[in-house]
């Protein structure tokens, strides 16, 4: 089983490098887009979304809370919010990371935290970006 923790996004180590492999993620994903560049795993309380570029390089991993679901099969990838990031308000995050918001986003190195109604909506991890700009942020509904 692969475990992704919030703290993984904020360390030099990052997430398990095996999850950079599109072929592996395809074998554990619950759903995927038509072109298979967007793959998602639905764990009990979180959706874990992997976005790959056309050359199969991991572009980002996105985590968002979902309505708790009943597990129909054993899961192979899990997200643990060990920083309770999804329980924090916009002001909590600004204070914790000493950052300001731009267009409902706070960026910290390879991480972009997106807010809706001053609550954390989603957490993005861009493994190959030294720093994120808002032009790199795409919603999950964006065409590939």
How would you label these PLM feature ranges?
Residues 1-109, 114-144:
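Short helix/turn-capping signatures at newly exposed starts of structured segments
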């Amino acid at each position: 089983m692969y475990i992704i923790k919030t703290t993984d996004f904020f360390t030099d180590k990052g997430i398990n490098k095996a999850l950079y492999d599109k072929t592996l993620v395809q074998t554990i994903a619950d759903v995927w887009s038509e072109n298979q560049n967007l793959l998602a795993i639905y764990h009990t309380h979180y959706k874990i979304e992997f976005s790959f570029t056309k050359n199969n390089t991991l572009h980002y991993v996105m985590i968002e809370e979902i309505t708790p679901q009943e597990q129909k099969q054993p899961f192979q990838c899990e997200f643990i919010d060990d920083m309770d990031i999804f329980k924090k308000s916009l002001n909590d995050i600004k204070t914790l990371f000493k950052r300001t918001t731009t267009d409902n986003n706070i960026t910290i190195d390879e991480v972009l935290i997106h807010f809706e109604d001053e609550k954390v909506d989603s957490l993005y991890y861009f493994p190959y970006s030294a720093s994120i700009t808002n032009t790199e942020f795409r919603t999950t509904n964006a065409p590939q």
